[in-house]
Amino acid sequence: MKKVYIKTFGCQMNEYDSDKMADVLGSAEGMVKTDNPEEADVILFNTCSVREKAQEKVFSDLGRIRPLKEANPDLIIGVGGCVASQEGDAIVKRAPFVDVVFGPQTLHRLPDLIESRKQSGRSQVDISFPEIEKFDHIPPAKVDGGAAFVSIMEGCSKYCSFCVVPYTRGEEVSRPFEDVLTEIAGLAAQGVKEITLLGQNVNAYRGLMSDGEIADFALLLEYVHEVPGVERIRFTTSHPREFSQRIIDCYAKLPKLVSHLHLPVQSGSDRVLMAMKRGYTGLEYKSIIRKLRAIRPDLCLSSDFIIGFPGETEADFEQTLKLVRDCEFDFSFVFIYSPRPGTPAANLPDDTPHAEKVRRLEALNEVIEAKGYAINQSMVGTVQRVLVENVSKKDATMLAARTANNRVVNFAGHPRLLGRMIEVKITAAFPHSLAGEALTSESA
């Protein structure tokens, strides 16, 4: 039986796409996944170009597997994802042993690209943007667990000045409404209890319905809520510009919509937000959070921040710190600005020393982590309903589960609980996780 090894970089959308690569090759070629590249017949890198470090790591990894190709010329090596879209033929020029290069929108063509490579003896490159075609060619997912991702739209039309996504994944294109619901119903029939709706700007969803009308994201949430078997709904990543009152109202009327929201703000400075072309102010962002917390006081909030954007002053950074304290984020992802070729921001002058950017990053992380730890500590003694996801990475005798507000809870339990929703009592808090004890018997 042939085997495929897939290494994934970057976002949850890439994780979803990697699963679909495996599904496509499994259906067309009978391949199964392996965690060992040395035993693989096909090695794929699903890449990310959001930051320079992630992009360069791909080429480092390609260099490390080159000896495998030299030892086995029949080994197929492929590069997909956003670096593939951005670099195209340049990847083959830099690493001539790469056999196939494909973009996020052409992963469904992998079997044909591999066959063309074998027949022609030449590297194959397909980084076109055939919009939503790939979903028509991907076989139904077979899942092993209680949670699953469902991509509902692709691309981004916001063109933030720092971001490569519109250039690597194309503009916003939404999947048809009924197609999304059919996929979710199929997953629920396989025992999936938690659905995470995915998109670069997931709340910009505008899906065509069978009657010719257009469904917005709020309507999709309402329909997903009614799918039998679905107990939890998450979504990521959303954009503040698209966070309508209709979506806010969903938090009041849809109990399956979890009390966790990832809403990237990037900066608390209006001047920086304008330079980033984000399309909102810090006050407008805080207004969204205020409305949500009036409905869901227990809302867990996470975000993304870019530190050291060109021209960011100490005063700008202080405004970011103030926004963080005002919004009380549970956790966030903080990065030093990384200029991406081809974006407007790449040409902006940047005179802030790197050491100062590091200082700001550490200061912001300190504030965010202190608040997150305090929230974790406040959960000790409470009973939480969790979805048991996997065996703990640190202790094979422990299970790892996730609360509705996105906390990882480690507890002693039998693997037969995997994929189930159970109740646990929180017994201890740590900076990035919780400990608990199961209140549900293993045979219940």
Swiss-Prot record:
Function: Catalyzes the methylthiolation of N6-(dimethylallyl)adenosine (i(6)A), leading to the formation of 2-methylthio-N6-(dimethylallyl)adenosine (ms(2)i(6)A) at position 37 in tRNAs that read codons beginning with uridine.
Cofactor descriptive note: Binds 2 [4Fe-4S] clusters. One cluster is coordinated with 3 cysteines and an exchangeable S-adenosyl-L-methionine.
Species this chain originates from: Chromobacterium violaceum (strain ATCC 12472 / DSM 30191 / JCM 1249 / CCUG 213 / NBRC 12614 / NCIMB 9131 / NCTC 9757 / MK)
Molecular-function GO terms, alphabetical: 4 iron, 4 sulfur cluster binding; metal ion binding; N6-isopentenyladenosine methylthiotransferase activity
Database matches in CDD domains: Radical_SAM
Domain Radical SAM core span(s) in chain numbering: 142-374
Swiss-Prot/TrEMBL cofactor(s): [4Fe-4S] cluster
Name of the gene: miaB
Protein name: tRNA-2-methylthio-N(6)-dimethylallyladenosine synthase
Swiss-Prot/TrEMBL catalytic activity: N(6)-dimethylallyladenosine(37) in tRNA + (sulfur carrier)-SH + AH2 + 2 S-adenosyl-L-methionine = 2-methylsulfanyl-N(6)-dimethylallyladenosine(37) in tRNA + (sulfur carrier)-H + 5'-deoxyadenosine + L-methionine + A + S-adenosyl-L-homocysteine + 2 H(+)
UniProt binding sites for [4Fe-4S] cluster 2: C156, C160, C163
Assembly information from the UniProt record: Monomer.
